[in-house]
C-alpha cells in the first residue's frame, strides 16, 4: 500500500469514534478522490501499473488473495467519469490522471482479434491469479471473453475512443445470443427460449443468463446511444417480466449468479433506468423504488446500504440518502459486489444444488471501488 494512502487511512480511522457509528466530520469528495488515486497501482511489483488491487476469497478459506482482473478498475473509472462535470477543476484534473494511468492497464485484457475483453489477463492467459494449483490450468481452463466486462470497460473508456468500438463490440454480443447456436439449460424453463444476450462470448461455454449482466449490456447501448435491436427489446422485456415476478427478491442468486444479492440487482436495474429510453422499462420504476426502500430498511452492511441509497437516487427519489458515515467503514470486506461461481456453468438442477452449497465460489472485494460508490452517492445528491 502506498504510504500516502496509509496516512489517509489512519486519519479516517481516528475521526471515527467507534466503528459503525456516524462521524461528525464531513468528508470532502476531493479527499476521497485523492485516496482512490493513491490506491491506484503505481509500479507496484504486486499488481500491474494503473489498476486497482482486488482481493478474492473462497467460500472455504479465510485467506484473501490478490486477483488481477479488468472488472473493478473499469467499474471505478465508469463510476467516477459519470460525474466529472460536477467535480472541481482540481478534481477533474486528478480524474484525468487516474484515467490516463488506467488506460494501458486494459491492453492485456483486450482480445487481439476481436473487440471484446476478458475478466483475466489474456497474454498469457491466467485464471485465478495467485491461485496455486489452479494456475496449472491457465491455458486449458482460460475463460472466454464476456459481455459484462466488455460493456463496463467500453463504458469506462468512452471519453477516450469513438463510437465505432462500441458498435463493433455490440455486434460481437449478437453472435452469442441465447438459442442462436445453443439454448440455456440453467435458467427458468418459462424463459429458456428467449432470444436475449448470453454472458459468454464463446461456443464452448453453456449459455448463461444473468439479470445484472443484461442491465450492463443494455447500458452500453443507452449511453452510446446505439439503436436498439430486437435482441435489446427482448432483453428489456425479460428484465421487466423478472421484476414483475419479483425474481430479484425471491431468487437473487439464481437469476443473477454473478452478483447474487437483491440489493446489487436493484442497483443495476436503477442505473439502467437512469439512462434508459425504453418506455415499457420506465413503467416498472415504482416497483423498483418500493423494493429498494424495503431492502434498505433491513440492510446491514455499509456497502449494501450505499448501493441501495444510490438505487433510490438513480430513480429520482430525493431524500436523506447521503451516507454520512466515515468512508473508512467501506474498507471492511464483509459485502462483495461480484462472485466467481461454478454454478453458472451448470445445467438445472445441478445449478441450484451447487448454488445452495456455495461450492467453488469466490467473493471479490475492492476498497477503491467501494469509495467510488461513496463518491457516486455524493454527486447524486448534488443538484
Where are these regions (language model features)?
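Bacterial Sec-dependent N-terminal signal peptides
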Residues: 1-23
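Preference for long, amphipathic alpha-helical scaffolds in soluble/luminal domains
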Residues: 21-383
Amino acid at each position: 500500500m502506498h504510504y500516502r494512502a496509509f496516512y489517509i487511512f489512519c486519519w479516517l480511522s481516528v475521526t471515527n469514534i467507534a466503528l459503525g457509528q456516524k462521524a461528525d466530520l464531513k468528508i470532502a469528495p476531493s479527499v476521497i478522490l485523492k485516496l482512490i488515486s493513491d490506491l491506484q497501482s503505481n509500479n507496484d511489483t504486486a499488481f500491474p501499473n494503473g489498476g486497482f488491487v482486488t482481493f478474492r476469497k473462497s467460500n472455504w478459506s479465510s485467506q484473501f488473495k490478490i486477483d488481477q482482473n479488468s472488472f473493478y478498475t473499469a467499474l471505478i473509472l465508469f463510476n467516477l467519469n459519470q460525474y466529472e462535470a460536477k467535480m472541481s477543476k482540481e478534481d477533474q484534473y486528478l480524474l484525468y490522471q487516474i484515467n490516463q494511468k488506467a488506460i494501458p492497464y486494459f491492453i492485456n485484457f483486450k482480445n487481439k482479434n476481436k473487440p471484446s475483453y476478458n475478466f483475466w489477463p489474456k497474454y498469457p492467459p491466467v485464471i485465478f491469479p495467485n491461485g496455486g494449483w489452479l494456475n496449472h490450468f491457465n491455458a486449458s481452463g482460460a475463460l472466454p471473453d464476456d459481455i459484462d466486462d466488455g460493456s463496463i470497460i467500453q463504458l469506462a473508456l468512452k471519453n477516450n475512443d469513438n463510437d465505432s468500438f462500441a458498435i463493433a463490440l455490440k455486434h460481437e454480443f449478437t453472435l452469442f445470443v441465447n438459442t442462436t447456436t445453443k439454448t440455456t439449460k440453467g435458467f427458468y424453463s418459462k424463459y429458456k427460449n428467449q432470444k436475449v444476450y448470453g454472458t459468454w462470448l464463446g461456443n464452448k461455454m453453456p449459455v448463461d443468463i444473468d439479470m445484472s449482466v443484461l442491465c450492463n449490456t443494455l447500458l452500453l447501448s443507452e449511453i452510446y446511444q446505439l439503436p436498439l435491436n430486437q435482441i435489446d427489446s427482448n432483453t428489456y422485456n425479460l428484465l421487466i417480466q423478472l421484476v414483475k415476478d419479483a425474481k430479484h427478491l425471491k431468487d437473487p442468486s439464481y437469476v443473477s449468479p454473478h452478483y447474487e444479492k437483491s440489493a446489487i440487482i436493484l442497483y443495476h436495474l436503477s442505473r439502467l433506468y437512469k439512462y434508459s429510453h425504453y418506455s415499457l422499462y420506465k413503467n416498472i420504476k415504482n416497483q423498483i423504488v418500493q423494493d429498494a426502500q424495503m431492502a434498505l430498511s433491513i440492510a446491514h452492511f455499509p456497502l449494501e446500504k450505499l448501493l441501495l441509497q444510490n438505487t433510490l437516487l438513480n430513480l429520482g427519489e430525493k431524500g436523506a440518502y447521503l451516507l454520512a458515515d466515515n468512508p473508512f467503514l467501506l474498507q471492511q470486506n464483509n459485502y462483495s459486489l461480484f462472485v466467481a461461481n461454478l454454478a453458472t456453468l451448470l445445467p438445472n438442477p445441478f445449478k441450484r444444488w451447487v448454488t445452495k452449497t456455495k461450492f467453488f465460489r469466490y467473493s471479490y472485494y475492492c476498497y477503491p471501488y467501494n469509495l467510488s460508490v461513496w463518491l457516486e452517492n455524493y454527486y447524486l445528491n448534488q443538484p
